C-alpha cells in the first residue's frame, strides 16, 4: 500500500490515540511517539504500529503517534484507519486487517 497524502485518525481524549501518517521520500517507517506511558509501554506501542503497517503492506511512511493510554485494539484500529485514508483506499481488503 502506497501512502500518497497526509491523514489522521483518532482523538486526543483520554484512553485514545491520534495517528498522523504521511508519505515519505525515504524507504522504511519513520515513527515519532508521544505517550503518557512511553517509559513502560513505548516499545510495545511501536511494535503494534509497525506490525499493523506491515500487514497492510506499507513500506514507507512518516508516522506520528500521540497516545493518551489507548488499548492495543484501539491503537491497531486507528493505525489502519489512518493508513487507509492516506492511501485513498476505497476497496478494503478485510482479510488483511
UniProtKB/Swiss-Prot annotation:
Where primarily located? cytoplasm
Q: What's the subunit arrangement here?
A: Oligomer with a subunit composition of (alpha,beta,gamma)6.
Read off the InterPro entries from this record.
Answer: CitD (IPR006495), Mal_deCO2ase/Cit_lyase_ACP (IPR023439)
Name of the protein: Citrate lyase acyl carrier protein 2
Which cellular compartments is it found in?
Answer: Cytoplasm
Is Cytoplasm one of the keywords?
yes
Q: Does the keyword Cytoplasm apply?
A: yes
| Family stated for the protein in its record | Belongs to the CitD family.
Keywords recorded for this protein, A-Z: Cytoplasm, Phosphoprotein
Database matches in HAMAP family: CitD
User: Which is a Gene Ontology cellular component entry for this protein?
Assistant: cytoplasm
Instruction: Identify the coding gene.
Output: citD2
User: Which residues are annotated with the PTM O-(phosphoribosyl dephospho-coenzyme A)serine?
Assistant: 14
Describe the task this protein carries out. Answer: Covalent carrier of the coenzyme of citrate lyase.
UniProt organism field: Salmonella typhimurium (strain LT2 / SGSC1412 / ATCC 700720)
* Pfam families to which the protein is assigned, alphabetical: ACP
Amino acid at each position: 500500500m502506497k501512502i500518497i497524502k497526509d491523514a489522521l485518525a483518532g482523538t486526543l481524549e483520554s484512553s485514545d490515540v491520534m495517528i498522523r501518517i504521511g508519505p515519505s521520500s525515504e524507504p522504511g517507517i519513520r515513527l515519532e511517539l508521544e505517550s503518557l506511558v512511553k517509559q513502560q509501554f513505548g516499545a510495545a506501542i511501536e511494535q503494534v504500529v509497525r506490525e499493523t503497517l506491515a500487514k497492510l503492506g506499507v513500506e514507507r511512511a512518516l508516522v506520528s503517534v500521540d497516545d493518551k493510554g489507548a488499548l492495543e485494539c484501539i491503537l491497531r484500529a486507528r493505525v489502519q484507519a489512518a493508513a487507509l485514508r492516506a492511501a485513498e483506499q476505497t476497496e478494503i481488503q478485510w482479510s488483511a486487517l
